[in-house]
């Protein structure tokens, strides 16, 4: 099935395709997004801790130099900050427009589940490089699911974590839809 594309007429009367929607039928296992590198600093750790309302003083700047540790560990959930999913980037890297970014009839691909595996701690001074790719597609009870995997390594090319993120790309007939 050919994906839906949006066609617009330019001022010269010529039609131009501006986007091809990343619908379930054109999502392919193995499609990959670009790599992203984020530097982990003590400030980034503290900002994240504040944003998620974690009061643990280990994540904040020390009160005095005597208390300062050589390295600050990041909380495990910070993996989502330093190695974000970036679905629209995966779509764009493969020539498509993510459904939530489509210019006409945009829609979400709702979260279904997430499973994280940690391999090494993330700490201040690390450079975390991550990328996402399509791990699997499946249909269950008429619903169509896509599972993404994000893999993250540090500056020593040591895997620090990976997570699988599954979302509903299409609901089965008669199930929760925008039209219902």
What are these regions (language model features)?
Residues 2-13:
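Short, Lys/Arg-enriched N-terminal segments with co-localized hydrophobic residues
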Residues 13-28, 111-113, 117-180:
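HotDog/MaoC-like acyl-thioester-processing domains
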Residues 15-111, 174-180:
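Hot-dog-fold acyl-thioester-processing enzymes
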């Amino acid at each position: 099935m050919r994906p839906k594309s949006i066609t617009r007429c330019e001022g010269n009367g010529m039609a131009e395709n501006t986007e091809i929607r990343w619908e379930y039928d054109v999502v392919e296992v193995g499609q990959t997004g670009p790599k992203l590198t984020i530097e982990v600093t003590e400030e980034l750790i503290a900002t994240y801790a504040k944003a998620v309302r974690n009061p643990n003083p280990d994540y904040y700047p020390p009160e005095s130099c005597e208390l300062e540790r050589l390295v600050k560990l990041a909380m495990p959930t910070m993996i989502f900050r330093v190695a974000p999913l970036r679905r629209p980037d995966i779509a764009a890297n493969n020539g498509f427009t993510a459904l939530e970014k489509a210019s006409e009839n945009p829609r979400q691909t709702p979260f279904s589940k997430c499973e994280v595996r940690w391999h090494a701690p993330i700490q201040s001074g690390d450079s975390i490089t991550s990328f996402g790719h399509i791990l699997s597609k499946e249909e269950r009870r008429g619903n169509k699911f896509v599972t993404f995997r994000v893999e993250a390594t540090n500056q020593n090319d040591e895997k620090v974590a990976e997570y699988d993120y599954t979302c509903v790309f299409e609901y089965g007939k008669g199930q929760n839809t925008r039209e219902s």
